[in-house]
Amino acid sequence: MALMILPFIGALSVSESLVALVTVCLVYLIIKSFQANIPEGLSRLPGPKPLPIIGNVLEVGSRPYLSLTEMSKRYGNVFQIQIGMRPVVVLSGNETVRQALIKQGDEFAGRPDLYSFRFISEGKSLAFSTDQAGVWRARRKLAYSALRSFSTLEGTTPEYSCVLEEHISKEAEYLIKQLDTVMKADGSFDPFRYIVVSVANVICGMCFGRRYDHHDRELLSLVNLSDEFGQVVGSGNPADFIPILQYLPNKTMKKFVNINDRFISFVQKIVSEHYATFNKDNIRDITDSLIDHCEDRKLDENANVQMSDEKVVGIVNDLFGAGLDTISTALSWSVMYLVAYPEIQERLYQELKENVGLDRTPVLSDRNNLPLLEAFILEIFRHSSFLPFTIPHCTTKDTSLNGYYIPKDTCVFINQWQINHDPELWKEPSSFNPDRFLSADGTEVNKVDGEKVMVFGLGKRRCIGEVIARNEVYMFLAILIQKLHFYNLPGEPLDMTPEYGLTMKHKRCHLRATVRVRSDH
């Protein structure tokens, strides 16, 4: 979101631009005159010289994950750029990022007060909130406990170990039938179109306890809202980095607020229904689990503060929005990689055939017996790096990193793409090779190497839905690979070039799939 300013620069009228220009120049001169003094023993942050008003926007360009990676080669793992009027510290390198987010976690646990963040979940988002004090931490802990409790809820029938497994398994089987139907009718399918609806249905089941028909208007409306959110964020909001623009007409920002209002209205309605029908002895979904953990509980021993209905709405909204975009993007990329590397697809199928068989559906407990599949997922996360940056961080106090002084309230970008493609960490990082995560005999995943892959952030702001997301990607993939063979249209090149956005997606395309019969191979 923070690196989307460039496409929007030309969208202002002449009068708006003149007002902004004069005001920003004055503010720029004032800020420059009050630059912080560097404490003795520390160095000033290196980085490219910014232009007035726009800063380093032109150098960052439309593919910031690449341009900032190149800058890190020149300036090191800690350097500063300027986006509009706001100084931004960019962190690269595995050790540097771990030092900041884990060892100095409290100092880098903030969120910058970006204008657009105030409108996500009406400012009550757990993920985007600038708050990181005791109450926020207690709420995060409570939300994490609720998710953990939900993930262990028993399924409705003995064949499923938990309700999470049941939701994913049933939806994956439905997706397979649908793709088979589409193939017979049209001869090809758009992978993202069908995957995103299936993932949305799983998340609706987990969050709201309800499953929709794939043509249901409410479900498709939610999917479209998520898509609109990504598009609007992708167009950028300069008001995040040039504050005076907050007071000027902004069609993109107006649309952004409208999308968030529509999302929150839907979730509020569902949460209200859950409160009205809540039964402590019958926890139906994540919303019930959150309500259960909030009922008559204090957030911590010293604060008589309970999580309000609005906070529950904010958490559910975060989980739905982030989960839908992240998981659907991961699975869509996975199918693309299966098509791009048919020999790996065949190895994955043989692994499933040998360790699970073809007479039953893969389950969560099979995961440890499928090391190649686990390595494949890790390599997709690493190679695609579809989440090139975390949500921006912010320093909570004056601090230092690698000998450089970083003032309080400095916006911080974490370049996950750089870490996932760092030649110091990975041999031939541009090559797609799941075997890099496997032991010599191919029977175990190297957990140390696996933990180096950056996808869900680190430290105190790490994604609380990570475990559920990883399980969902694993189960969907295991079932799809067991039942379907994916391949490309004859003569059609497969374009794996990512399109930069909130999450990086591949270009929309059409693929083919055939249902495997049990006698295959």
Swiss-Prot record:
The gene coding this protein: cyp1a1
Binding site for substrate: 229
GO biological process: hormone biosynthetic process; progesterone metabolic process
Major location category of this protein: endoplasmic reticulum
Cofactor: heme
InterPro entries noted in UniProt: Cyt_P450, Cyt_P450_CS, Cyt_P450_E_grp-I, Cyt_P450_E_grp-I_CYP1, Cyt_P450_sf
Family matches, as PROSITE patterns: CYTOCHROME_P450
Record-level GO cellular component terms: endoplasmic reticulum membrane
Binding site residues for heme: 463
Keyword terms, alphabetized: Endoplasmic reticulum, Heme, Iron, Membrane, Metal-binding, Microsome, Monooxygenase, Oxidoreductase
Name assigned to this protein: Cytochrome P450 1A1
Source superkingdom: Eukaryota
Lipid bilayer topology: Peripheral membrane protein
EC number assigned by the record: 1.14.14.1
Family note: Belongs to the cytochrome P450 family.
Function comment: Cytochromes P450 are a group of heme-thiolate monooxygenases. They oxidize a variety of structurally unrelated compounds, including steroids, fatty acids, and xenobiotics.
Subcellular location: Endoplasmic reticulum membrane; Microsome membrane
Organism expressing this protein natively: Chelon auratus (Golden grey mullet)
Catalytic activity: an organic molecule + reduced [NADPH--hemoprotein reductase] + O2 = an alcohol + oxidized [NADPH--hemoprotein reductase] + H2O + H(+)
Keyword Transcription regulation: no
GO MF terms, alphabetically ordered: heme binding; iron ion binding; steroid 17-alpha-monooxygenase activity
